[in-house]
């Protein structure tokens, strides 16, 4: 395990990006005429360039032009062992490979719900990371993404997760609760999790597909599998009535509910939001109640 982490750190140091400007201690690269990205100081120094609490700007101005900061580049924070927290603006849509690898003091980072992509080894060996939330649109947990994040005690897989790659969540030695909101058990490759972690971690899954998780390869190796409770949906921002998951309850949800009554979707999170009166059945009663709420 340590050899792998050392290799990745050495490899990442050879892939540093140059920067064009510095804004409040954050190094910014420029691509084309509209895109800016967070990077490091490049190859001019081997010293970690970030420490403490870092706030990434939403926009920067360069040569008289305004750029949105849209991504965190490969290895941007790699090996910054005194970095403690990072705040990302909603303009950031992607975290590139090895972006935070080896940030051993990183305790927290906000991941905007607008985020589209978190790539492989992004948080490898962030051994102090205590909490991180994936965006609800996330469909893949890539290889080594959270490898050896040994301080995580709980983790949430949103309802659109479809695939978990090998080594994605290995060596999470403090993990006690894993919440998976996907109705269909995601394709979890062999080695996605460490078997030792699975034996002491409780897996929380949608009530109606609990049996599927108990039978599927990899998932069945969790020692304790239990159904998700209502308060756990609410804690993660799911709302009764917000059927389309956009954070608002309006006419769009009412129209979608009308369609759902005719053709019930497989997505348990959508069904949970559509069950307005909480009786376990989605029908005209829910439609009438939602219409009154709007």
Would you name each region that the model predicts?
Residues 190-195, 211-222:
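Short, aromatic/basic amphipathic alpha-helical patches
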């Amino acid at each position: 395990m340590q050899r792998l982490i050392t290799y990745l750190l050495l490899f990442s140091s050879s892939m540093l990006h140059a920067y064009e400007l510095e804004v409040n201690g954050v190094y910014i690269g420029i691509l084309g005429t509209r895109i800016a990205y967070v990077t490091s100081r490049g190859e001019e120094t081997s010293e970690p360039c970030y420490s403490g609490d870092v706030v990434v700007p939403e926009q920067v101005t360069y040569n008289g032009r305004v750029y949105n900061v849209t991504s965190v580049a490969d290895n941007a924070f790699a090996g910054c062992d005194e970095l403690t927290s990072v705040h990302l603006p909603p303009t950031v849509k992607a975290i590139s490979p090895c972006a935070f690898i080896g940030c051993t003091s990183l305790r927290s980072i906000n991941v905007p719900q607008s985020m589209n992509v978190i790539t492989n080894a992004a948080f490898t060996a962030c051994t102090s990371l205590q909490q991180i939330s994936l965006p609800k649109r996330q469909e893949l947990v890539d290889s080594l993404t959270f490898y050896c994040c040994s301080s995580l005690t709980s983790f949430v897989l949103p309802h659109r997760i479809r695939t978990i790659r090998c080594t994605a969540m290995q060596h999470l030695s403090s993990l006690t609760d894993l919440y998976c909101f996907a109705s269909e058990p995601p394709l979890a490759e062999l080695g996605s999790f460490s078997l030792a972690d699975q034996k002491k971690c409780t897996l929380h899954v949608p009530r109606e597909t609990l049996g599927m998780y108990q039978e599927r390869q990899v998932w069945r190796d969790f020692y304790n599998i239990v159904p998700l409770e209502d308060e756990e949906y609410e804690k993660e921002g799911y709302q009764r009535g917000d059927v389309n998951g956009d954070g608002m309850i309006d006419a769009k949800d009412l129209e979608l509910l009308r369609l759902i009554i005719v053709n019930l979707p497989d997505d348990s999170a959508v069904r949970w939001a559509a069950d307005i009166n909480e009786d376990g059945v989605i029908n005209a009663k829910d439609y009438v109640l939602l219409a009154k709420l709007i």
